[in-house]
Amino acid sequence: MIASVRGEVLDIALDHVVIEAAGVGYKVMATPATLATLRRGSEARLITAMIVREDSQTLYGFADSDARDLFLTLLGVSGIGPSIALGALAMYDGPTLRQAIGDGDLTALTRIPKVGKKTAELLALTLRDKVGSSTSSGVAAAGGHGIRGPVVEALVGLGFAVKQAEEATDKVLANDPEATTSSALRAALSMLGKK
């Protein structure tokens, strides 16, 4: 696939740029921040991800490979397509987006266009370990509890907010470090039921 494009900038629009490389004009979708760094007539190089669908082949361009890698990671979440992933990177820079996902910050994640509460919870739950998390949300995980993730995931699946599920699971595991998945889930449900 096409990993990068370098050449003269022929045209810049609100959501894409056309870069001529070896006599071919490539339309590359990009965030407004990336597009703002480009100038018509100058040479540019964008790191790209090529998304092939049944009815289209689309290039997405990024200033660096970290942004491209985060874009591809976002695509791994059910319900997140290229336009939402690009919208997330348009809304937040890479470190800020990683922090929001790592912290399970649903308020920040629901500000992304076309991302509702359920999708934000799924983003946080699915990608927390892949994009990194803050020290406050990773206390139990850092302690080596392999059951934390499955318990939190089960609680979210039952309709609890990610933050609630994490707090309850962390309290249960702090009180009983030897808990099994099922005993931790029962204790967390009991704790959440009392609130």
From Swiss-Prot:
What protein name does the entry list?
Answer: Holliday junction branch migration complex subunit RuvA
Q: Does the keyword Signal apply?
A: no
Q: One GO BP annotation here?
A: DNA recombination
Q: What one GO molecular function would you report for this record?
A: ATP binding
Task: Using the UniProt annotation, give all residue ranges assigned to the region (Flexible linker).
Answer: 138-142
Highest taxon in the source lineage: Bacteria
> What does UniProt give as GO cellular component?
cytoplasm; Holliday junction helicase complex; Holliday junction resolvase complex
- What HAMAP family does its record include? DNA_HJ_migration_RuvA
CDD domains in the cross-refs: UBA_RuvA_C
Location relative to the cell: Cytoplasm
